[in-house]
Amino acid sequence: MIRIKDNFKNYKKHKKILKLSKGFIGSNSKIFKISNQKIMKALYFSFSDRKKKKRSNKKIWINRINYFLKNYFFNNFNYNKIINKIKLNKICINKKILSEIIINDYKTIYKLKNMLT
């Protein structure tokens, strides 16, 4: 029986993994076995970090809103009370948009204040 050295499918698989690991340092981008492990770990972390990014952005929006309300806008209001008033008045605005309005557009904030009070 003839021994077959080259397997086309494995060659393609190895090339694909080594192409994905381009830019990794040292043997992490040169050796298939190591680069395969690094790619698997990188893909795992990229998935979980996309979820973490959403969580951290939501925290940032809430902190911005709360800081603005306590220091500049309302005297004794905090985030919970304002969100509750917005929902009771049936104003369709989410946390992200509200934080962007706070940063960029003061006229809209004062209109919102007049609607809530």
Curated annotation (Swiss-Prot):
- What GO molecular function annotations does the UniProt record carry, in alphabetical order? rRNA binding; structural constituent of ribosome
Q: Which GO terms describe its cellular component?
A: plastid; ribonucleoprotein complex; ribosome
User: What PROSITE patterns is this protein classified in?
Assistant: RIBOSOMAL_L20 (PS00937)
Q: Which domain of life, per UniProt?
A: Eukaryota
The keyword Translocase belongs to this UniProt entry's keyword annotation? no
Gene3D superfamilies from the entry? 6.10.160.10, Ribosomal protein L20 (1.10.1900.20)
Cell compartments where the protein resides:
Plastid
What is a biological process (GO) this protein takes part in? translation
Which terms are listed as keywords in the entry?
Plastid, Ribonucleoprotein, Ribosomal protein, RNA-binding, rRNA-binding
Q: Does the keyword rRNA-binding apply?
A: yes
- Alphabetized InterPro entries for the sequence: Ribosomal_bL20 (IPR005813), RIBOSOMAL_L20_CS (IPR049946), Ribosomal_protein_bL20_C (IPR035566)
Q: What is the stated purpose of this protein?
A: Binds directly to 23S ribosomal RNA and is necessary for the in vitro assembly process of the 50S ribosomal subunit. It is not involved in the protein synthesizing functions of that subunit.
Family named by the database record: Belongs to the bacterial ribosomal protein bL20 family.
- Name of this chain's protein: Large ribosomal subunit protein bL20c
Q: Which organism is it from?
A: Euglena longa (Euglenophycean alga)
